[in-house]
Swiss-Prot record:
Keywords for this protein: Viral genome packaging, Viral release from host cell
One family name in Pfam for this protein: DNA_Packaging_2
Function: During the growth of this phage, DNA is synthesized as concatemers. During DNA packaging mature monomers are cut from the concatemers.
Superkingdom of origin organism: Viruses
Protein name listed in UniProt: DNA maturase A
Amino acid sequence: MEVDKSLIAFLEMLDTAMAQRMLADLANDEKRTPQLYNAINKLLDRHKFQIGKLQPDVHILGGLAGALEEYKEKVGDNGLTDDDIYTLQ
């Protein structure tokens, strides 16, 4: 069965437009209601949104994403460099 890519593209655009409007509504005190939060939660659930899986967006964060990668390369799983470990001993 062949997937209709035009339908997928349409649904992605629709979902994106809806998410953008929800985000704009969050800034409006009158529109920021429990129903809005519920709709946002449903959107996030539908996309199986998990904060732990997010990756930094280079276009938004600029050099911060690169700095994060450099930091990860220099420190161990405990967040310490070799110099830090030596100093603590």
